[in-house]
Amino acid sequence: MRERTVTYSPAFTLVPTRECFNRCGYCNFRADRGAAWLQPAEVRALLLPLVGSGVVEILVLSGEVHPHDPRRGEWFAMIEDICAVALELGFLPHTNCGVLSFEEMRALQQLNVSLGLMLEIDSNRLLGGVHRHAPSKIPALRTAQLEWAGALGIPFTTGLLLGIGETPAEREDTLRTIARLQDRHGHIQEVILQPHSPGGSQSWAGEPLGDAQLLGVVRLARQILPAEITIQIPPNLVGDPVPLLEAGARDLGGIGPVDVVNPDYAHPVVERLGERLAAAGWRLEPRLPVYPHLDKRVATALQPLLGEHRARLCQAAVT
């Protein structure tokens, strides 16, 4: 059987804060105002043991402080500081901290090899459903974020959250929105297809998205999205990943100790996952948090460190 390749990112997630002004009905991550903010000493204490461990990506994943909150500047400075420490220790940051201003995106571009924001579903209808109390989930705000990332030339990850009350037509519309943005800017490296997976902290009583439904969305996405966009599926949220790979998915995302967004669903052990995939003819390989064809879009100051990681990854692939 010919072996095919599927990738993952050896990652560790840092959460600056779970405080978030959104109250999405399906969320198992957020906390109210007053939740702890990560302190500088904590960042170093968490990252230092990871040096030399094989972890490359530091995923900075944060709750959102409202743009008009007087603490917004302090919140954003904390995120910048976390990225700077990660770079200092030799890691490659990727930040997803919600909807940002153009200037905030420009600032993070200097400290991250890529950024991310889930488009989720490009439909205002859900503002009367699971996004009723989530002001930053207005689709126009999120598509603007993807547009700005393209204008700035930032390698970008986005995705759909599936099974949150959307229709099949809305899924297709969302994929076509992403495809149009990619046609304009060429900056989108991957699209995550994330099935809603109920957790113990959410307020919405929605059912999980079935594997058969997800399989159909993967096939549709591969038909609609440009070929250079990789389709990602989260291995801890699906039953058997192999049919999804056969349908066109080629990445399993960042795999680390804990899935902080879906804490009820443990990440698989990479070695066991690799064995399982190998039995089906797939080779599991690590990747960086920016895809090779977008390396040149990464900020000049980050190119030496990125080059070191790219060379190390290429060397490992031939030994």
Curated annotation (Swiss-Prot):
Q: Give the cofactor binding note.
A: Binds 1 [4Fe-4S] cluster. The cluster is coordinated with 3 cysteines and an exchangeable S-adenosyl-L-methionine.
Tell me the cofactors it needs. [4Fe-4S] cluster
Q: Which InterPro entries does this one have?
A: Aldolase_TIM (IPR013785), CofG_family (IPR019939), Elp3/MiaA/NifB-like_rSAM (IPR006638), F420 (IPR034405), rSAM (IPR007197)
**UniProtKB keywords:** 4Fe-4S, Iron, Iron-sulfur, Lyase, Metal-binding, S-adenosyl-L-methionine
Per the record, the pathway is:
Cofactor biosynthesis; coenzyme F0 biosynthesis
The GO molecular function terms of this record are:
4 iron, 4 sulfur cluster binding; 7,8-didemethyl-8-hydroxy-5-deazariboflavin synthase activity; iron ion binding; transferase activity, transferring alkyl or aryl (other than methyl) groups
Locate the residues binding [4Fe-4S] cluster.
C20, C24, C27
Q: Where is the Radical SAM core domain?
A: 6-236
Task: Return the broad EC class.
Answer: lyase
Q: What Enzyme Commission number(s) does the record list for this chain?
A: 4.3.1.32
Q: Does the keyword Iron apply?
A: yes
Catalytic activity, as annotated: 5-amino-5-(4-hydroxybenzyl)-6-(D-ribitylimino)-5,6-dihydrouracil + S-adenosyl-L-methionine = 7,8-didemethyl-8-hydroxy-5-deazariboflavin + 5'-deoxyadenosine + L-methionine + NH4(+) + H(+)
Q: Which domain of life is it from?
A: Bacteria
In this record, what's one Pfam family?
Answer: Radical_SAM
> PANTHER family, per this entry?
7,8-DIDEMETHYL-8-HYDROXY-5-DEAZARIBOFLAVIN SYNTHASE, FO SYNTHASE (COFH)
What task does this protein carry out?
Answer: Catalyzes the radical-mediated synthesis of 7,8-didemethyl-8-hydroxy-5-deazariboflavin from 5-amino-5-(4-hydroxybenzyl)-6-(D-ribitylimino)-5,6-dihydrouracil.
* Assembly with partners or alone: Consists of two subunits, CofG and CofH.
Task: Please state what the protein is called.
Answer: 7,8-didemethyl-8-hydroxy-5-deazariboflavin synthase
Identify the coding gene: cofG
